[in-house]
Amino acid sequence: MKFGEFKVGQIFKSRIVIDKDDFQKYISFAKTGNILHEKPELAAKEGIKGTLLPGRAIIARVEGEMTRLDIFSDSIMLLYGMDGDPNWDNRHCRFLGEVYAGDELEVEYSVSDKKEGNSGSYGILSIDVQIRRISDNKSL
């Protein structure tokens, strides 16, 4: 889809699953150290009911999924940030619940802002992302 065809309010959805193998690959690549991942018996004592996925792993997978959607296949994408930029209405990244390896997730990408560049054939899209676990319909 070309930049000019995107409209504020458009919504695109996809489903993803991050399994235990994906989790191990992420931990190996990111070199993430977290006692809840390294000591499952301690995690279980703390009420963790499985392989808890790191938030950054979820963000990476959700961003990667967006690049594979046909709608964005002709786009150059950059992650500008998730830090409450006042130009983007101070949006932040926050998780509302836990995600475990094997959870099936629905990811909703919505175009929340569009700023045209000089030629009108390119510009910046702001994409809001919401994640929902399919099994219990919980927003994450």
Residue ranges and their predicted role:
Residues 1-11, 95-140:
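HotDog/MaoC-like acyl-thioester-processing domains
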Residues 1-88:
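Hot-dog-fold acyl-thioester-processing enzymes
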Residues 88-94:
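A beta-strand/beta-hairpin structural motif
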